[in-house]
Amino acid sequence: MAVSRITRWRLMSVIFGIKCLFLMVTLGVLLINSFTIQNIQSTPSPTTTVEFQEVSECCVCLDKWVGHQCNCYFISKEEKSWKRSRDFCASQNSSLLQPQSRNELSFMNFSQTFFWIGMHYSEKRNAWLWEDGTVPSKDLFPEFSVIRPEHCIVYSPSKSVSAESCENKNRYICKKLPI
């Protein structure tokens, strides 16, 4: 009788151990699948950005931002004053566009719209300045040297710049590094 009790307990222990092993393997498979699904869902898809985004190997931009040459651009559809445009860009952890070269905007088709960029005239320094306080390179827009206090710069469809009152309302372009 004692032998049959021991045999029963052994048999139940073996069955219980096999069930535990099966449950641990199942749990491991579920955890691996869960992490794989989370990684896929958290990776932004190139189709979540605006329709004319160029796919770049090093750009991952938020929805409604355009990726180009490892930068992200927000091209507004609404019009605001220069200051309100600057404030909007700042709220998005970006700044009004400060182009590094004339070619930087060549990938966009501007049609007939003017866009604020990050340049304004500082009466205090008697110079055109970027939003960050630096002086623009003379090579960037050599044709532009107009002195107009209380004016800011718009980028035009003809791929040139002009000065307008900062209170005028225009569309705007924000720029930031990719996520």
Swiss-Prot record:
Residues 68-175 form the C-type lectin domain. It is a single-pass type II membrane protein. Residues 1-10 are cytoplasmic. One of its GO terms (molecular function) is protein antigen binding. PANTHER family: C-TYPE LECTIN PROTEINS (PTHR22800), NATURAL KILLER CELLS ANTIGEN CD94 (PTHR22800:SF252). Can form disulfide-bonded heterodimer with NKG2 family members KLRC1 and KLRC2. KLRD1-KLRC1 heterodimer interacts with peptide-bound MHC-E-B2M heterotrimeric complex. KLRD1 plays a prominent role in directly interacting with MHC-E. KLRD1-KLRC1 interacts with much higher affinity with peptide-bound MHC-E-B2M than KLRD1-KLRC2. Interacts with the adapter protein TYROBP/DAP12; this interaction is required for cell surface expression and cell activation. This is Natural killer cells antigen CD94. The lineage of its organism: Eukaryota, Metazoa, Chordata, Craniata, Vertebrata.
